[in-house]
Amino acid sequence: MTINHYSLMSLCFFALALLIKSMPFLDIELLKFFNSLMFSELFFAYFTEIGNGLVCLAIIIPVLSYFSHKTSLNSVKIQTLVMVGLIIGAIVKILKELASFSVRPGYYQLEDINYLEPVFSYNSFPSGHAATIIGISFVWISLAFRGITTKHAGLIISLVIFLALSVSLSRVIVAAHWLSDI
Protein backbone atom coordinates (compact mmCIF):
# COMPACT_ATOMS: atom_id res chain seq x y z
CA MET A 1 0.00 0.00 0.00
CA THR A 2 1.38 3.37 -0.96
CA ILE A 3 0.42 6.66 0.59
CA ASN A 4 0.10 9.64 -1.71
CA HIS A 5 1.27 13.16 -0.92
CA TYR A 6 -2.24 14.47 -0.22
CA SER A 7 -2.92 11.74 2.34
CA LEU A 8 0.39 12.40 4.05
CA MET A 9 -0.25 16.15 4.09
CA SER A 10 -3.76 15.56 5.47
CA LEU A 11 -2.38 13.40 8.28
CA CYS A 12 0.18 16.09 9.14
CA PHE A 13 -2.51 18.79 9.27
CA PHE A 14 -4.72 16.53 11.39
CA ALA A 15 -1.89 15.89 13.85
CA LEU A 16 -1.14 19.62 13.99
CA ALA A 17 -4.82 20.40 14.66
CA LEU A 18 -4.93 17.88 17.50
CA LEU A 19 -1.78 19.38 18.97
CA ILE A 20 -3.21 22.91 18.81
CA LYS A 21 -6.60 21.76 20.15
CA SER A 22 -4.87 20.21 23.16
CA MET A 23 -3.33 23.59 24.03
CA PRO A 24 -6.18 26.17 24.16
CA PHE A 25 -3.83 29.04 25.02
CA LEU A 26 -2.03 28.42 21.72
CA ASP A 27 -5.34 28.47 19.83
CA ILE A 28 -6.16 31.84 21.43
CA GLU A 29 -2.76 33.32 20.58
CA LEU A 30 -3.02 32.07 16.99
CA LEU A 31 -6.52 33.56 16.76
CA LYS A 32 -5.18 36.93 17.96
CA PHE A 33 -2.32 36.78 15.46
CA PHE A 34 -4.50 35.94 12.46
CA ASN A 35 -7.22 38.36 13.55
CA SER A 36 -4.65 41.16 13.53
CA LEU A 37 -4.27 40.54 9.78
CA MET A 38 -7.82 41.78 9.08
CA PHE A 39 -7.09 44.87 7.01
CA SER A 40 -10.61 45.36 5.65
CA GLU A 41 -13.86 44.07 7.11
CA LEU A 42 -15.60 44.56 3.76
CA PHE A 43 -13.00 42.51 1.88
CA PHE A 44 -13.02 39.65 4.38
CA ALA A 45 -16.82 39.63 4.64
CA TYR A 46 -16.91 38.59 0.98
CA PHE A 47 -13.61 36.70 0.70
CA THR A 48 -14.42 34.28 3.52
CA GLU A 49 -17.70 33.38 1.80
CA ILE A 50 -15.82 31.83 -1.15
CA GLY A 51 -15.75 28.67 0.97
CA ASN A 52 -19.51 28.70 1.50
CA GLY A 53 -21.08 25.63 -0.10
CA LEU A 54 -23.53 27.70 -2.14
CA VAL A 55 -20.81 30.01 -3.46
CA CYS A 56 -18.69 26.98 -4.36
CA LEU A 57 -21.69 25.48 -6.15
CA ALA A 58 -22.49 28.68 -8.05
CA ILE A 59 -18.99 29.98 -8.85
CA ILE A 60 -15.98 27.87 -7.85
CA ILE A 61 -17.13 24.50 -9.21
CA PRO A 62 -18.22 25.85 -12.63
CA VAL A 63 -14.99 27.88 -12.98
CA LEU A 64 -12.76 24.92 -12.12
CA SER A 65 -14.72 22.59 -14.39
CA TYR A 66 -14.70 25.07 -17.28
CA PHE A 67 -10.97 25.72 -16.84
CA SER A 68 -10.13 22.02 -16.92
CA HIS A 69 -12.37 21.50 -19.96
CA LYS A 70 -10.95 24.39 -22.00
CA THR A 71 -7.26 23.67 -21.34
CA SER A 72 -4.99 20.69 -21.88
CA LEU A 73 -5.91 19.31 -18.45
CA ASN A 74 -8.21 16.35 -17.88
CA SER A 75 -11.82 17.49 -18.04
CA VAL A 76 -13.40 17.40 -14.59
CA LYS A 77 -17.20 17.21 -14.75
CA ILE A 78 -19.32 19.58 -12.72
CA GLN A 79 -21.30 16.62 -11.37
CA THR A 80 -18.16 15.12 -9.85
CA LEU A 81 -17.30 18.31 -7.97
CA VAL A 82 -20.93 18.82 -6.89
CA MET A 83 -20.99 15.29 -5.44
CA VAL A 84 -17.72 15.99 -3.62
CA GLY A 85 -19.25 19.18 -2.18
CA LEU A 86 -22.39 17.33 -1.07
CA ILE A 87 -20.40 14.53 0.56
CA ILE A 88 -18.18 17.04 2.36
CA GLY A 89 -21.27 18.96 3.48
CA ALA A 90 -22.84 15.80 4.90
CA ILE A 91 -19.64 14.80 6.71
CA VAL A 92 -19.26 18.32 8.17
CA LYS A 93 -22.90 18.30 9.32
CA ILE A 94 -22.44 14.94 11.06
CA LEU A 95 -19.19 16.08 12.72
CA LYS A 96 -20.82 19.33 13.87
CA GLU A 97 -23.64 17.31 15.47
CA LEU A 98 -21.14 15.01 17.19
CA ALA A 99 -19.00 17.94 18.36
CA SER A 100 -21.87 20.29 19.22
CA PHE A 101 -20.10 21.17 22.46
CA SER A 102 -17.31 22.98 20.61
CA VAL A 103 -17.56 26.72 21.07
CA ARG A 104 -16.51 29.40 18.63
CA PRO A 105 -14.28 32.35 19.48
CA GLY A 106 -17.41 34.52 19.67
CA TYR A 107 -18.52 32.59 22.75
CA TYR A 108 -15.71 34.11 24.81
CA GLN A 109 -16.05 37.69 23.49
CA LEU A 110 -12.33 38.33 23.89
CA GLU A 111 -11.65 42.06 24.12
CA ASP A 112 -8.76 42.35 21.67
CA ILE A 113 -10.47 40.39 18.88
CA ASN A 114 -12.26 42.07 16.00
CA TYR A 115 -15.31 39.87 15.30
CA LEU A 116 -16.99 40.02 11.92
CA GLU A 117 -20.79 39.87 12.10
CA PRO A 118 -22.71 37.64 12.56
CA VAL A 119 -21.05 36.25 15.68
CA PHE A 120 -21.93 32.62 16.40
CA SER A 121 -21.11 30.88 19.67
CA TYR A 122 -21.36 27.14 19.04
CA ASN A 123 -20.63 24.39 16.49
CA SER A 124 -17.09 25.50 15.83
CA PHE A 125 -15.60 22.19 14.70
CA PRO A 126 -15.14 21.61 11.81
CA SER A 127 -15.21 24.68 9.60
CA GLY A 128 -17.60 23.93 6.76
CA HIS A 129 -16.20 26.73 4.59
CA ALA A 130 -12.65 25.43 4.95
CA ALA A 131 -13.59 21.79 4.42
CA THR A 132 -15.59 22.63 1.29
CA ILE A 133 -13.02 24.80 -0.49
CA ILE A 134 -10.07 22.56 0.41
CA GLY A 135 -11.90 19.34 -0.46
CA ILE A 136 -13.14 20.59 -3.82
CA SER A 137 -9.74 22.08 -4.65
CA PHE A 138 -7.80 18.91 -3.85
CA VAL A 139 -10.22 16.65 -5.73
CA TRP A 140 -10.10 18.97 -8.75
CA ILE A 141 -6.29 19.04 -8.68
CA SER A 142 -6.02 15.25 -8.40
CA LEU A 143 -8.47 14.66 -11.28
CA ALA A 144 -7.39 17.49 -13.58
CA PHE A 145 -3.69 16.67 -13.38
CA ARG A 146 -3.89 12.85 -13.31
CA GLY A 147 -1.40 11.54 -15.85
CA ILE A 148 -0.77 15.01 -17.25
CA THR A 149 2.47 16.94 -17.28
CA THR A 150 2.16 20.52 -18.40
CA LYS A 151 4.58 23.37 -18.29
CA HIS A 152 2.43 25.40 -15.90
CA ALA A 153 1.15 22.58 -13.67
CA GLY A 154 3.11 23.71 -10.63
CA LEU A 155 1.87 27.28 -10.96
CA ILE A 156 -1.78 26.29 -11.39
CA ILE A 157 -1.68 23.82 -8.50
CA SER A 158 0.06 26.38 -6.27
CA LEU A 159 -2.52 29.07 -7.08
CA VAL A 160 -5.48 26.78 -6.38
CA ILE A 161 -3.96 25.56 -3.10
CA PHE A 162 -3.05 29.13 -2.12
CA LEU A 163 -6.64 30.27 -2.74
CA ALA A 164 -8.07 27.34 -0.76
CA LEU A 165 -5.72 27.88 2.18
CA SER A 166 -6.30 31.66 2.12
CA VAL A 167 -10.07 31.21 2.24
CA SER A 168 -9.67 28.67 5.05
CA LEU A 169 -7.42 30.98 7.07
CA SER A 170 -9.86 33.84 6.50
CA ARG A 171 -12.26 31.94 8.78
CA VAL A 172 -9.74 32.48 11.59
CA ILE A 173 -9.00 36.06 10.53
CA VAL A 174 -12.69 37.00 10.90
CA ALA A 175 -12.77 35.12 14.25
CA ALA A 176 -15.45 32.67 13.10
CA HIS A 177 -13.25 29.65 13.91
CA TRP A 178 -10.16 28.59 15.79
CA LEU A 179 -7.15 27.57 13.73
CA SER A 180 -7.61 24.01 14.98
CA ASP A 181 -11.11 23.95 13.43
CA ILE A 182 -9.88 24.35 9.91
Language-model regions, residue ranges each:
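Hydrophobic alpha-helical transmembrane segments
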Residues: 50-68, 129-137
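N-terminal transmembrane-helix/juxtamembrane module of multi-pass inner/ER membrane proteins
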Residues: 1-59, 96-119
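Membrane-water interface at transmembrane helix exits
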Residues: 31, 64, 92-100, 141, ...
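Membrane-embedded catalytic cores of phosphoryl/pyrophosphoryl-handling enzymes
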Residues: 2-3, 113-182
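Aromatic-anchored segments of alpha-helical transmembrane domains
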Residues: 15-21, 86-93, 162-175
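Interfacial segments of alpha-helical transmembrane regions
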Residues: 62-94, 157
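Membrane-interface helix-boundary motifs at transmembrane edges
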Residues: 1-3, 67-80, 145-152
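Alpha-helical transmembrane segments of integral membrane proteins
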Residues: 4-12, 76-84, 152-159
